[in-house]
Amino acid sequence: MSEIRNYTLNFGPQHPAAHGVLRLILEIDGEVIERADPHIGLLHRGTEKLVESKPYNQSIGYMDRLDYVSMMCNEHAYVMAIEAMLNLKVPKRAQYIRVMFDEITRILNHLMWLGTHGLDVGAMSIFLYAFREREKLIDCYEAVSGSRMHATYYRPGGVYRDLPDKMPQYLASDFRTSKELETMNENRQGSLLDFIADFVKEFPKSIKQYDDLLTDNRIWKQRLVNIGVVSANRAKQLGFTGPMLRGSGVEWDLRKNQPYAVYDQLKFDIPVGMTGDSYDRYLVRMEEMRQSNYIIKQCVKWLRENPGAVMSDDHKVSQPKRTNMKNDMESLIHHFKLFTEGYCLPEGEVYRAVEHPKGEFGVYLISDGANKPYRVKIRAPGFSHLAAMNEMTRGHMLSDVVTIIGTQDVVFGEIDR
């Protein structure tokens, strides 16, 4: 009689629910997962080594391409590390702008997660709802940086430029009538802050729509409740951070526990789960969007009342004004040196981390006194979460693997680096 053995199934790396180039070797008994072995590295681009070959100010763009749905949060950790080494003072207005865009980025990330997680488990319409709002926030990225994704907006010493006084508008085309164009540009008549204020006012209605679609939906709860349960103690042992840790009931958020920028001057709550399952993590992220919306509202109010500089006036680090370069030789030299050689950091090492939408995103930077880093180590939150895949899926059905990948909210740009 032949021996009965478990079936080995390859999941990915080309799979619509893999959220990138994830390959899972699944050992299954019928439809029950016995073992899940994640294979990573298929998107490895050697980012940490690339950063070592460029001056400090030329590596900000690499950060955008790590977690490519949470771009500005990646930049924030890197520029904070450089600023700490240089003892560089960042203008308060620039810090408020950074916090505002960190929270815009958090909403962008969670909308992407919500839409794709819905598609993974069969809720098709939520994807269209989520991307409706996401498009508006992507326009805010474009307004300040000219880019819809890889902004490179944060710079050591502040941000690239102040918020624009005029929000970009849709142009006439053969594909839209004049009436449609007028409707699309209705809330784009003022400044970027006016546009964001309008978004903040309307966004709670959108979150209620998502709630109505999913939160009490019987099928949604059947797919998420008691799936991928991780206890609070085990979540800490596994190195979970962000919504994965808070979903297990641990109230840990760097914005509250180790405040940076101006988070200690803002009011917001930290949502935590109770059971540590996929449904709790869904509820945590939904509430995080509400809290981010509230933080943005406070930032808009402060920025309207407090004009000022958005970049350090140390021109060894920040570029001089172009008007000065036309008349002042020293400004021209500083500009040339800044974009060819960059600047040197004192010898030493520093670790700076931010509360990224996916967890703790940290940059450990070692300087040997040159104009390039000696070593940059990136602490990606998704790496620890994916490492728990075997433990989270064991004993679940094959269809639940897709739910667990979705609830982890993994992006392989940061995991593979």
Swiss-Prot record:
One Pfam family named in its UniProt record: Complex1_49kDa
Family matches, as InterPro entries: NADH_Q_OxRdtase_suD, NADH_UbQ_OxRdtase_49kDa_CS, NDH1_su_D/H, NiFe-Hase_large
Source organism, top-level taxon: Bacteria
Reactions catalysed: a quinone + NADH + 5 H(+)(in) = a quinol + NAD(+) + 4 H(+)(out)
Keyword NAD: yes
Major enzyme class: translocase
EC number in record: 7.1.1.-
GO molecular function: NAD binding; NADH:ubiquinone reductase (non-electrogenic) activity; quinone binding
Keywords tagged on the record: Cell inner membrane, Cell membrane, Membrane, NAD, Quinone, Translocase, Transport, Ubiquinone
Lipid bilayer topology: Peripheral membrane protein
Subcellular compartments: Cell inner membrane
A GO CC term assigned to this protein in UniProt: plasma membrane
HAMAP family registered for this protein in UniProt: NDH1_NuoD
Protein task: NDH-1 shuttles electrons from NADH, via FMN and iron-sulfur (Fe-S) centers, to quinones in the respiratory chain. The immediate electron acceptor for the enzyme in this species is believed to be ubiquinone. Couples the redox reaction to proton translocation (for every two electrons transferred, four hydrogen ions are translocated across the cytoplasmic membrane), and thus conserves the redox energy in a proton gradient.
Quaternary state and interactors: NDH-1 is composed of 14 different subunits. Subunits NuoB, C, D, E, F, and G constitute the peripheral sector of the complex.
UniProt family annotation: Belongs to the complex I 49 kDa subunit family.
Record-given protein name: NADH-quinone oxidoreductase subunit D
Protein's organism: Vesicomyosocius okutanii subsp. Calyptogena okutanii (strain HA)
